[in-house]
Swiss-Prot record:
It holds the Pfam family Ribosomal_L2. It comes from Tetrahymena thermophila (strain SB210). SUPFAM superfamilies: Nucleic acid-binding proteins, Translation proteins SH3-like domain. Coiled coil: none annotated. The keyword DNA damage does not apply. GO terms for cellular component: cytosolic large ribosomal subunit. PANTHER family: LARGE RIBOSOMAL SUBUNIT PROTEIN UL2 (PTHR13691:SF16), RIBOSOMAL PROTEIN L2 (PTHR13691). Its main location: cytoplasm. Belongs to the universal ribosomal protein uL2 family. NCBIfam families: PRK09612.1. This is Large ribosomal subunit protein uL2. Keywords: Cytoplasm, Ribonucleoprotein, Ribosomal protein, RNA-binding, rRNA-binding. It is found in: Cytoplasm.
């Protein structure tokens, strides 16, 4: 009888694969979308730029004066490139277009780069949040009700024009350019995110541990495709694949053709 495989243990969200909450500062999100932002603007001051373990982008600790009560509210925004401690941040419909300010996306001109874009009005930030990422505004509808943006992946998406966005690029760009160098650095990187590392291949395991394990040499021994209706312990490999192989005209096929030509 086989064991419970790695994919099944991950899905249970137990302590082994659950990311640690200790050391985390706060959720990186906008203010609650209130009357002050919908009709005018509100000013905040960046108290500090902080690092949160497990997050690549730095966070800006912004203090806002509550427009309805005599107190100060503290929010944590994803910092834009060029922001600094003591800088004023303006959020709202009538805010100026400057790096770090938060505006409805239909108020920002075409061609502007933005980050931390909302997908739905008031969801407090969804797209382009990783360090060095940005989205580009392609165009607006005539009534300003819809806006089309290009995401960091190159995909284009249409979102409501009232969704908020930060002008500029997310700070911390070039983070992935620095080499890891040591396995210890890689270990601590994945330990913070609670991802299994190093990742053992299924064909290198015993048959009791994985459907691809076992044999006198490392091979799967049967088609890698598996039905979407298969049991949880069988769902490894190419799950519910519509097709297999290289995509004709794709980047991987072109690289394979170049390698074959160079070998000739």
């Amino acid at each position: 009888m086989g064991r419970v495989i790695r994919a099944q243990r991950k899905g249970r969200a137990n302590g082994v694969y659950k990311s640690h909450k200790s050391g985390r500062i706060a959720p990186a999100q906008y203010r609650v979308y209130d009357f002050a932002e919908r009709q005018g603007y509100i000013r905040g001051c960046i108290r500090d730029i902080v690092h949160e373990p497990g997050r690549g982008a730095p966070l800006a600790e912004v203090a806002f004066r509550d427009p309805y009560r005599y107190k100060t509210n503290k929010e944590h925004f994803i910092a834009a490139e060029g922001q600094y401690s003591g800088q004023y941040v303006y959020c709202g419909l009538k805010a100026q277009i400057a790096v770090g300010n938060v505006l409805p996306i239909n108020r920002i001109p075409e061609g502007t780069v933005v980050c931390n874009v909302e997908e739905k009005v008031g969801d407090r930030g969804t797209f382009s949040r990783a360090s060095g990422c940005y989205a580009t505004i392609i165009g607006h509808s005539e009534d300003g009700d819809k806006t089309r943006i290009r995401l960091p992946s190159g995909a284009r998406k249409t979102i409501p024009g009232s969704c908020r966005a930060t002008v500029g690029i997310v700070a911390g760009g070039g983070r992935t350019d620095k080499p890891i160098l040591k396995a210890g650095n890689q270990f601590h990187k994945y330990a913070r995110k609670r991802k299994s590392w190093p990742r053992v291949r299924g064909v290198a395991m015993n048959p009791v541990d994985h459907p691809h394990g076992g044999g006198n040499h490392q091979h799967i021994g049967h088609p890698a495709t598996v039905s979407k209706w298969a049991s949880a312990g069988q769902k490894v490999g190419l799950r519910a694949a519509r097709r297999t192989g290289l995509v004709r005209g794709g980047q991987k096929e072109k690289m394979a053709m170049k390698a074959a030509a160079a070998g000739v």
